[in-house]
């Protein structure tokens, strides 16, 4: 009986070894590349325990979400463009808070942080309009060579940080060592699994002249697991384990320990059959299909002079729009304000932002969740008519609502 048990265990062991070897060597050689995709949602979620000079402050929970739209090459980009480069226009917004007891951070109408960038075939990301996001640039990136499980490569990337939320972003170069693990399935999608490690090193010769002048140095370690879409080359999931310390010239040291997670999601498809007909019946509402989604332009919208306060009667139009938007249960709405050109660029920018937020608040007051609105102001930078006539200026004073998809 003992001899029989031994034989069974021996053959079971041999089978397991054979299965393992076959599984490893059956993995095909692969070529990683960024092929681009249509519109997508990028989410960066951090859960970091913060310590100031060794004293525990709390769990810093932060979520940065964005709606990113594929776009044509911007007119401002003239040289150094590869035909395979992909260009994107992003609207980022931040939800942040400090938790000690797991309480949920309150949310509401979001202010857009605009961003424009391009991504090369190897995953290198170059900023065109930089307001601090995305915070990981050129990560992950891919080699030109064919890869087998266990193969390694190194590549530089940039991480944009603002540890104290001062509104001053410091860009830190990082040298990342990648390892290709295997091909696998994730939620029904073919993906590549990659691991990555790098060290945070800042200070001395590594210095960002445009960054936080109070930041003296930074050091730490990162270890990440990455799932990359085989179809698009997008990193659909990154889970980064972090331990890093930022030192300031005033003697303050801030340490963060925890995780940073990145997700790629895709916006819901909007069923336009139920909304195009009622929209066509609304007065002074122009409906247009754009790369971001269906855009509603509220024409001749009347505000008090130099104010975000609507004139009496305008709320009736907004109520009719809200009735339609309520029938779109999952989509986000981008509300973008525009002004005529009066020569006061900064004033126009502020006024356009305030008017966008005023419209979003009015729509939210009808029962649409406030956290579905992203507000953006473009001042007088996007005219649709000449500002040399009263009629043209009236057309330029408008608010656009895009149903993002």
Give the positions of each predicted feature.
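Sec/Tat signal peptide C-region and signal peptidase I cleavage site
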Residues: 20-26
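Bacterial N-terminal signal peptides
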Residues: 9-19
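Periplasmic peptidoglycan-binding/tethering modules of Gram-negative envelope proteins
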Residues: 249, 260-332
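Solvent-exposed loop/turn segments at secondary-structure junctions
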Residues: 160-162, 200-201, 302-304, 339-343, ...
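Periplasmic OmpA-like peptidoglycan-binding domain that tethers envelope proteins to the cell wall
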Residues: 308-313, 326-330, 334-405
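Stable alpha-helical elements in mature extracytoplasmic
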Residues: 109, 146-149, 314-317, 321, ...
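Signature of exported/secreted
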Residues: 27-284, 288
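Bacterial N-terminal signal peptides that target proteins for export
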Residues: 1-11
């Amino acid at each position: 009986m003992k001899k029989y048990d031994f034989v069974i265990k021996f053959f079971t062991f041999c089978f397991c070894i054979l299965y393992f070897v076959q599984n490893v060597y059956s993995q095909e050689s692969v070529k990683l590349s960024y092929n681009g995709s249509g519109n997508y949602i990028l989410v960066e979620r951090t859960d970091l325990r913060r310590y100031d000079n060794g004293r525990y402050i709390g769990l810093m929970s932060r979520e940065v979400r964005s709606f990113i739209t594929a776009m044509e090459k911007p007119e401002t980009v003239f040289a150094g463009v590869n035909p395979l480069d992909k260009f994107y226009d992003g609207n980022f917004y931040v939800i942040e808070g400090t938790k000690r007891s797991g309480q949920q951070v309150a949310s509401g109408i979001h202010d857009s942080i605009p961003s424009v960038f391009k991504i090369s075939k190897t995953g290198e990301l170059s900023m065109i309009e930089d307001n601090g996001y995305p915070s990981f640039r050129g990560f992950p990136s891919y080699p030109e060579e064919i890869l087998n499980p266990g193969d390694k490569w190194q590549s530089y990337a940039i991480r944009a940080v603002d540890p104290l939320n001062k509104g001053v972003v410091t860009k830190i170069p990082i040298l990342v060592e990648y390892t290709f693990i295997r091909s696998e399935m994730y939620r029904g999608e073919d993906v590549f699994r990659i691991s990555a490690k790098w060290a945070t090193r800042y200070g001395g010769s590594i210095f960002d002249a445009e960054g936080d002048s109070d930041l003296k140095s930074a050091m730490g370690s990162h270890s990440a697991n990455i799932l990359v879409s085989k179809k698009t080359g997008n990193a659909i999931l990154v889970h980064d384990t972090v331990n890093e310390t930022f030192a300031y010239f005033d003697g303050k040291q801030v340490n963060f320990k925890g995780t940073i997670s990145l997700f790629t999601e895709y916006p819901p498809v909007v069923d336009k059959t139920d909304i195009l007909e009622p929209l066509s019946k609304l007065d002074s509402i122009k409906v247009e299909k754009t790369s971001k989604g269906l855009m509603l332009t509220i024409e001749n919208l009347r505000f008090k002079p130099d104010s975000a306060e609507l004139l009496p009667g305008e709320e009736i139009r907004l109520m009719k729009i809200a009735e339609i938007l309520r029938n779109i249960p999952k989509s986000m709405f981008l509300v973008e304000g525009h002004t005529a050109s009066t020569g006061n660029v900064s004033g126009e920018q502020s006024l356009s932002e305030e008017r966008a937020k005023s419209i979003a608040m009015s729509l939210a007051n009808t029962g649409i969740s406030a956290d579905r609105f992203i507000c953006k102001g473009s001042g007088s930078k996007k005219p649709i008519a000449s500002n040399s006539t009263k009629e043209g200026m009236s057309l330029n004073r408008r608010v656009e609502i895009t149903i993002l998809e």
